[in-house]
Regions:
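Non-catalytic helical/linker scaffolds that mediate oligomerization, partner binding
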Residues: 1-169
Length: 169
């Protein structure tokens, strides 16, 4: 579960504004998109296909989650499909490594990027660098301590508040 670091006061029913859920299965996505407090979903390609076919993009912000490991180029027709989904209402991409960011930049889609915790944003200099690249937002690194977070510019950041985090990604 991702939540924005700063935002408006609690929404209706005391919900947290800006709550985003990263789902690995369609079952998880179906459960999450039905919740009012959830603003958006991060979905892998095969789940995004199903979500877009069901029109979930008309109810929630959807972001295509890149895999943790990327090769030199995206699979055939990946960006053709992603561009179509953007036209149909998908909001952007969850980027987990520099290779994926490079692929987005090559396609002119870097301004649709949300950086995951695996992308370097440990300090204000790194945050400033990525903001100059035009990304939508970043995610606070998992390893940061509270004191380090207090000294970091978190205005355009998400913070993971709950989840299963594998030891090695």
């Amino acid at each position: 579960v991702f939540a924005t670091m700063e935002g408006s006061p609690a929404g209706k029913n005391g919900s947290i504004p800006g709550m985003f859920i990263s789902c690995e299965t369609m079952e998880q996505a179906e459960t999450a998109w039905q919740r009012d407090e959830v603003q958006g979903l991060y979905l892998p390609y095969f789940v995004m296909e199903q979500a877009m076919a069901r029109g979930i993009q008309n109810q929630k912000e959807l972001y295509l989650a890149f895999p943790y490991i990327a090769r030199e180029q995206a699979p055939e027709h990946f960006f053709e499909t992603a561009l179509r989904w953007l036209e149909e209402g998908m909001k952007g991409f969850l980027v987990r490594n520099l290779e994926s960011y490079g692929m987005l930049k090559k396609q002119g889609l870097e301004k649709s990027a949300v950086l995951d915790t695996t992308m370097y944003t440990w300090n204000n200099e790194a945050v400033d660098f990525w903001e100059k690249q035009g990304i939508l937002k970043n995610t606070v690194p998992l390893e940061l301590k509270e004191a380090e977070m207090r000294h970091r510019d978190n205005r355009n950041s998400e913070l993971i508040v709950y989840g299963y985090i594998p030891l090695m990604q």
